[in-house]
A protein has these predicted regions:
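Non-catalytic structural scaffold of enzyme domains
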Residues: 1-172
Length: 172
């Protein structure tokens, strides 16, 4: 049995959700989590900077002798998948499972994608959804003002009130 940990990383702490699911489904596995709270959020940065950070994050985990890497960051999954595929250990990200869940759950073929500027600009989620479903009706929206408060709450524990107000403003 391979006792090395599974490495999980995100640009902040949002990937703790993925880590929690790993713990639930693989309770006997060791997990090493890296949340890059010093450079969060990645999604407002340029593609090459995101790729640089992702490579550094992946290399950090490899140096800690992980047996697999999970990029629990939608932005990294969108713009740096090829870097993960080049790792010497199995690589997983959140793009395909997220797109598959959206396709499976829609009842009318309409799918909304919210994400960082880099995620939306990459078109990765749209392409994956279109690969999985015939003629989906995909709507994409960059939510600058919502994603930062989510990151801030994760980092500081500050109330979600501002996030709710911002989200309400977007639907008016």
């Amino acid at each position: 049995m391979d006792n090395r940990p599974i490495g999980v990383f995100d640009s902040g702490l949002g990937g703790l959700t993925a880590m929690r699911e790993l713990i639930r489904t693989l309770p006997n596995e060791n997990i090493l989590y890296f949340g890059d709270t010093g450079r969060v959020p990645y999604g407002s940065r340029g593609r090459e900077i995101i790729r640089k950070y992702a490579k550094q994050d992946m290399n950090f985990l490899i140096r800690h002798d992980v047996k697999a890497v999970l990029a629990a960051c939608g932005t990294v999954s969108s713009v740096a998948r090829d870097l993960g595929d080049a790792l010497p250990v199995p690589y997983f990200d959140v793009l395909r499972p997220t797109a598959r869940a959206a396709v499976e759950q829609t009842k009318n073929g309409k799918i909304g994608i919210i994400g960082t500027a880099a995620t939306i600009a990459s078109g990765s989620y749209r392409k994956e959804i279109e690969r999985l479903a015939p003629n989906p009706d995909v709507y994409e929206n960059v939510l600058h003002d919502v994603l930062r408060p989510v990151s801030l709450q994760e980092e500081t524990g500050v109330s979600h009130q501002r996030r709710v107000i911002t989200a309400a403003h977007l639907v008016e």
